[in-house]
């Protein structure tokens, strides 16, 4: 966990271009922290005053962009929970990486035979039930095999038994439109 100096920028739920200031920055945020676990959760927590200029605009499913640490580019998170504290006059905002939307997609049936993770990722993208504009990249050069049936793409990459992380090892890194396996 790392405290964030930059204030999150608020965007509408259906935004696709984040090269602007959206609805504005949550400059009055009292707390902003990104939590990222290796091959696991990637979430943003914000405490914002009810007197803040954007309080009335904040709702579930909206997007927040913030620099998650001192090294990575700003990342987009989707709000999934708002908890109002009427005594403190604040709202606690919880948001998860936008890439979690991939759990709503599915690989029906795909056998990966003696291939690299990059080839497996390319095949996975081709076999998704719904098209995606996410890119999947790996620099691991070893070959192995696995089989996926009715699994979402995030589970294929870093889930339990048979995932690429399980079969090849490595670590995932999430970008706004790219997931890397190193």
Predicted segments — roles?
Residues 45, 81-98:
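Short, solvent-exposed secondary-structure boundary/capping segments
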Residues 1-57, 96-102, 117:
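Juxtamembrane "anchor/assembly" segments of surface/extracellular structural proteins
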Residues 56-58, 87-89, 103-105:
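Short acidic, gly/pro-rich beta-turn/loop elements at beta-sheet edges
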Residues 2-17, 49-85, 111-133, 162, ...:
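Short, acidic/charged, Gly/Pro-enriched secondary-structure junctions
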Residues 42, 75, 89-91, 177:
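Envelope-exposed proteins and targeting segments
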Residues 8, 44-46, 64-66, 79, ...:
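Hydrophobic beta-strand residues in large extracellular and virion-surface proteins
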Residues 96-182:
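Charged- and aromatic-enriched interaction segments used to assemble
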Residues 32-37, 80-84, 171-173:
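Short, exposed beta-strand/loop patches in secreted or surface proteins that constitute
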């Amino acid at each position: 966990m790392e405290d964030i100096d930059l204030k999150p920028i608020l965007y509408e739920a259906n935004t696709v271009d984040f090269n602007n200031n959206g609805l504005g920055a949550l400059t009055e945020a009292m707390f902003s922290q990104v939590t990222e676990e290796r091959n696991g959760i990637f979430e943003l927590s914000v405490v914002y005053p009810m007197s803040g200029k954007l309080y009335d605009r904040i709702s579930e499913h909206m997007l927040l962009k913030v620099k998650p640490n001192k090294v990575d580019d700003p990342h987009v998170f989707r709000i999934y929970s708002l908890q109002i504290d009427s005594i403190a006059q604040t709202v606690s905002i919880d948001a998860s990486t936008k890439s979690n939307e991939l759990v709503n997609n599915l690989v029906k049936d795909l056998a990966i035979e003696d291939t690299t993770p990059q080839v497996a990722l390319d095949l996975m993208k081709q076999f998704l039930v719904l098209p995606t504009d996410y890119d999947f990249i790996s620099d691991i050069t070893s070959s192995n095999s696995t089989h996926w049936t009715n699994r979402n793409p995030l589970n294929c990459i870093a889930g339990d038994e048979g995932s690429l992380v399980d079969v090849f090892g490595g670590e995932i890194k999430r970008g706004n439109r790219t997931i890397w396996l190193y």
